[in-house]
Amino acid sequence: MPANNMISREQAEALIREQVVPEIFQKAATQSTFMGLARKLPNMTSKQTRIRVLDVLPVAYWVNGDTGFKQTTEQAWDNVYLTAAELAVIVPIPEAVLDDAEFDIMGEVTPRVIEAIGKRVDEAIIFDKARPAEWDAGIIVRARQAGNNVANSSDLYAAILGENGVFNKVEEYGYAVNGVIASRGMRAKLRGLRDDNGQPIYNTTMQGATNYALDGAPMYFPANGSFDKDRAQLIAGDFSQAVYAIRQDVTVKILDQGVIQDPSNGQIIYNLAQQDMIALRVVFRMGWALPNPATALDGDRLGCPFAYLAPSTPMTTQTVTFTVTTGSGGDTANVEGAIVDVNGARLKTNSSGVAVFNLPAGSYTATIKKKGYNTDTESITVASSAVTKSVSLTPAT
């Protein structure tokens, strides 16, 4: 027998145990950035919750002389509604796959689905992407109508903190910035800021950790994939002004009966019982609002407690022009000072009865009102061209 005979690794491969690390390497599931910063209200007890907000401020007048007449004033309130919208997903899994898996598939899928819910919430509320029809316009759209968008600039410091910068836009309406959301690429831009002598402004040492904050307001860099760099580079605002409430917390249910159907054609995709499958169903319902009450600096509620730094190529919007008149036939007149509310974004008509919005593609509901006239409601669809809308208000009787 040769002295160099041996059992090689190849010959014994079938008997060698392969070490399997009982862990799946993945990032910790991240939740909604917006829900971590905004103010949470008590859970909703129905699909819609009403918030009363100050709409008209009282005015004080000087009295002329000892026998002067004291003038009267008014104060009014408006209703802002939180409407619960539903997020849901179904994950079908064959039972054979569950039986053969080395990991708890259900335990791995659930946190990723919850992260996906957080991403959708942030996209809809902050960036107005895939927004439910019953929700108000997102923060970016509201800020845009208030003029709280700042063009991209090579002088990043001035664009954010200087006069007419992002922070100043918020402050002009009487709010103080208490939080900033930015793309992850903004970290490098801030670290690269230099003064006239070439010294770093944002961090003083390359070895120490950088404390990301602006004018005392902490910065957050969403890791759930929701931040849209094509719509904003940075968003700053008073997050205490934004509120949300939960109608149904994240509910996970495992189904082993029923069918999954294609809603477009009615075709059955999966029959759980017949195909030995289960389905993980996750449901979440919540509503949000930006009440934007009247303040001493914004009595008409035309402002927004948020502002943003636009990307080099601003997001595509179309002008939506409302012309508000009263009367009929040849006896018509422009209505100046009418409030046009498009999904929460408000503008006031000028002396020509005109209010011009800049809106991304989507469907909107407009409410036009003025004291002494009946309120009018219009539906608006924005696509790839400008939209004009003529509105005729009738005097209240």
Please identify what each model-predicted range represents:
Residues 2-89:
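Assembly/oligomerization interface modules of large self-assembling protein complexes
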Residues 1-20, 40, 270-317, 397:
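Protruding loop/beta-arch "assembly-hinge" segments enriched in small, turn-prone residues
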Residues 318-320, 328-344:
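Short, ordered, surface-exposed loop/turn motifs in non-cytosolic proteins
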Residues 362-372:
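A short, solvent-exposed beta-strand micro-motif common in secreted/extracellular proteins
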Residues 45, 142-278, 284:
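Extended oligomerization regions of viral-like shell subunits
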Residues 81, 86-89, 93-172, 307-316:
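Alpha-helical scaffold segments that mediate packing/assembly in large oligomeric complexes
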Residues 371-396:
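Structured interaction patches on ligand/partner-binding surfaces of diverse proteins
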